[in-house]
Curated annotation (Swiss-Prot):
It is found in: Cytoplasm. One of its GO terms (biological process) is translational termination. Keywords: Cytoplasm, Protein biosynthesis. This is Ribosome-recycling factor. HAMAP family: RRF. The gene is frr. Its main location: cytoplasm. One of its GO terms (molecular function) is ribosomal large subunit binding. Pfam families: RRF. Belongs to the RRF family. One of its GO terms (cellular component) is cytoplasm.
């Protein structure tokens, strides 16, 4: 029973970490990364589809992304989706190839992104601690109901704290790496 609760805690914390990592990956750094376009949805074929399902996206150089559209009829819809995404890319079209240019970032933009990164990181750490607290509350209720002993509660608490520390370390490491990437000109 305790192992199930510990596994639940670990799963919930890892899901939170996964969401955090995808949020951090979406923060633009001034360098071309194909993953920046992952969230773009295109209105085509009578519905909404992700950009990467109707084209291939590659990095040409540090400042340029190439979007090779598989069906030339979708170029207009893709251009509209990119403009509506407000990512600030400059672009040019050459047939079925859309060339996206990543604009240079000012120092103020970089500092604001670091602040945003710090807020996202702190929110994630708070979520992780809340998960830990919820799990510990469940364990205390179980101990009050005499389902587990006080020793089991203490041991489980130490193990859950260890999991919490590991996840928070990953958050801190990711924050520091992304901060360095953002501030590097």
């Amino acid at each position: 029973m305790i192992n199930t609760i510990k596994q639940d805690a670990k799963n919930r914390m890892e899901k939170t970490l996964s969401v955090y990592l995808s949020d951090v990956d979406g923060i633009r750094t001034g360098r071309a990364r194909a993953s920046v376009l992952d969230g773009i949805v295109v209105e085509t074929y009578g519905g909404r589809v992700k950009l990467n399902t109707i084209s291939s996206i590659s990095v040409s150089d540090n400042k340029t992304l190439l979007v090779k559209v598989w069906d030339i009829n979708n170029v207009g819809a893709i251009k509209t989706a990119i403009i509506n995404s407000n990512l600030g890319f400059g672009f040019s079209c050459e047939g079925a190839v859309i060339r996206l240019t990543v604009p240079d970032m000012t120092q103020d933009m970089r500092k604001n992104l670091v602040k945003l990164l710090g807020k996202i990181s702190e929110d994630c750490r708070i979520s992780i601690r809340n998960i830990r607290r919820d799990i510990m509350d469940k364990l205390k209720i179980m101990q009050d109901n005499k389902d587990i002993s006080e020793d089991d509660l203490r041991i489980a608490g130490v193990e859950i704290q260890k999991i919490t520390d590991e996840i928070i370390k990953k958050i801190n490491d990711t924050f520091l790496a992304k901060e360095k990437e953002l501030l590097h000109v």
